[in-house]
């Protein structure tokens, strides 16, 4: 009798624990089996999705020695991208001024240059090169040609070729053509979260990776650099320039995911507008600071006025006009210097002000979407455009975890980036990520896809989301056990557990009903069949295996930044499996 009572107590204890474990799983998540999928032979996979990609009959064998023709307007970083492409197949290049018989020819040029590649390329769709960052790429019977709107656009064409070369078997490539462009001018991420700052290596690695997906902006606004804000008037020391600024500028220029250096001159020791002499003196201080980083390699700057006192529309307009004119004066001496000037307004949480219409045309107006945790929606972008006379530069506070640091936010594509938004009413989109730079790539990949070619449906967004994990994990099109495990884990690490200020993100969607039904039976003490037990045991086992798989073979940098969550999966699944099996017995 005592033994039976003890057994019943142990079973009741087990039921309480498994109720807790399943409740935890509903909150944290669970995974189903994760077989590696094989891509169907439907063509080359390129992300972001090109606007147009077509295939012609046939293919050809590329030669190991290729002949390359570069036009004068192609910069060294774009040439380096082609060398990287060729290295994927162990191919070597010699450079000449025209096509050579007996070799695969690769031609890289700029539209409208009237040089060799421009004249040889042939026709393209009307209006293609009126679009942002547009390029045409074609592979045709032994010749690969890339024609860009400028050298950056040619770089994007070569980046598409990079992803195609990764899928080429041997050296046999299909005949195809791509015509492509960006929907949004500025695409990237901003280091503006509250939390542990990224290291210089984190920042460089993220820019390098972003360059493979046609991102063009790493917006520098970290909380750990006093010379960005509190001491914005002070120049950097030589050591700071060499260890902090130059490496970031170099990584940004090489990847074309440029290091956008921002100053916040409106919060501490602010620009003075109380006299002409004071204003001119402060303007020179700000220009000297920007000039220092431009000399160190920075090729785009930005100005912030958020969370500070409002100095008035006329004063903002004057400063932005003066800075725009100054950039125009500098540009001839600094190749690649961007005239585009992002500006974060004091009213960044609002819906726009009419005085923004007075800003110079090159100024991009940074807004968060009508609230702090705003979203890219037609409602906001259309309303703002009607008021300001131009589209907003969207600062989206996702997937940042400022108010939920115990969480990883590994999803939310269509919640924050709505399908079908009019691209003509958006000038930029940057995401504010988590303090964990590497897992933030899942969301950043979504922005890369969206800002280049805005998805029209949830299905398109889901396709990008499911594809993201292989590109996040190993920058390639092939599914691996590790990337599949990361995807399955991530589907259950999405909800940010915040208040009504932010739209709730759902996780564990595919398993929620099953888990809740099991939890109800455990709680009520209802009979659970062996099949139901085995089903839940399988789910926990697959989850356990996913964690172990990623720990064993996943990306080292990602693993190091999500190790506490992997540990949590291990502990939870061990406890849950032991108790479930105990109850079943």
Regions found by a protein language model. Give the residues of each.
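Acidic, contiguous N-terminal accessory segments
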Residues: 23, 40-141, 169-178
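C-terminal functional modules
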Residues: 456-585
């Amino acid at each position: 009798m005592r033994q039976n009572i003890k057994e019943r107590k142990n079973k009741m204890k087990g039921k309480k624990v498994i109720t807790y474990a399943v409740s935890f799983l509903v909150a944290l998540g669970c995974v189903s089996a994760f077989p590696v999928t094989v891509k169907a032979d439907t063509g080359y996979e390129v992300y972001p999705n090109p606007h147009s990609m077509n295939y012609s009959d046939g293919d050809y064998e590329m030669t190991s020695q290729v002949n390359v023709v570069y036009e004068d307007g192609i910069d060294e970083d774009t040439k380096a991208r082609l060398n990287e492409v060729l290295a994927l197949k162990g191919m070597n290049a010699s450079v000449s001024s025209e096509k050579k018989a007996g070799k695969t020819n690769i031609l890289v040029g700029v539209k409208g240059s009237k040089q060799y590649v421009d004249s040889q390329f042939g026709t393209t769709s009307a209006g293609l090169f009126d679009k942002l960052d547009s390029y045409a790429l074609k592979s045709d019977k032994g010749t690969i040609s890339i024609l860009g709107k400028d050298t950056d656009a040619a770089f994007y064409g070569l980046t598409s070729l990079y992803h195609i070369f990764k899928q080429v078997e041997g050296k046999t490539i299909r005949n195809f053509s791509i015509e492509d462009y960006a929907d949004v001018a500025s695409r990237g991420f901003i280091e503006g979260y509250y939390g542990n700052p990224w290291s210089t290596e984190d920042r460089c690695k993220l820019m390098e990776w972003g360059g493979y997906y046609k991102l063009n902006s790493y917006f520098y606004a970290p909380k750990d650099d006093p010379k960005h804000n509190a001491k914005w008037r002070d120049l950097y020391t030589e050591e700071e320039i060499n260890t902090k600024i130059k490496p970031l500028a170099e990584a940004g220029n090489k990847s074309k995911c440029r290091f956008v250096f921002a100053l916040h001159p409106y919060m501490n020791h602010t620009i003075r507008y109380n006299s002409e002499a004071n204003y001119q003196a402060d303007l020179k201080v700000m220009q000297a600071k920007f000039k220092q980083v431009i000399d160190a390699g920075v090729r785009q700057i930005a100005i912030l006025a958020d969370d500070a006192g409002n100095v008035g529309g006329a004063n903002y307009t004057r400063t932005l006009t003066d800075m725009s004119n100054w950039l125009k004066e500098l540009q001839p001496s600094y190749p690649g210097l961007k005239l585009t000037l992002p500006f974060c307004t004091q009213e960044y949480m609002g819906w726009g002000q009419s005085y923004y219409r007075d800003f110079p045309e090159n100024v991009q107006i940074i807004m968060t979407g009508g609230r702090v945790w705003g979203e890219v929606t037609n409602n906001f972008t259309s309303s703002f455009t009607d008021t300001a006379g131009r589209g907003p530069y969207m600062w989206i506070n996702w997937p940042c975890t400022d108010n939920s640091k115990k969480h990883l936010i590994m999803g939310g594509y269509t919640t924050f980036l709505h399908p079908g938004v009019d691209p003509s009413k958006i000038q930029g989109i940057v995401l504010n990520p988590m303090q964990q730079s590497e897992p933030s790539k899942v969301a950043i990949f979504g922005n890369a896809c969206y800002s280049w070619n805005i998805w029209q449906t949830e299905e398109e967004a889901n396709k990008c989301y499911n594809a993201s994990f292989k590109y996040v994990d190993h920058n390639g099109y092939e599914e691996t056990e590790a990337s599949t495990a990361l995807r399955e884990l991530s589907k259950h690490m999405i909800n940010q557990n915040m208040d009504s200020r932010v739209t709730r993100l759902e996780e564990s969607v595919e398993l929620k009903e099953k888990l809740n039904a099991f939890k109800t039976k455990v709680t009520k003490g209802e009979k659970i069949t062996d099949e139901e037990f085995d089903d839940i045991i399988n789910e926990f086992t697959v989850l356990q295996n996913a964690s172990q798989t990623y720990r064993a073979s996943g990306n080292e940098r990602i693993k190091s930044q999500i190790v506490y969550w992997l540990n949590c999966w291990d502990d939870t699944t061990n406890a849950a499996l032991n108790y479930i099996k105990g109850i079943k017995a």
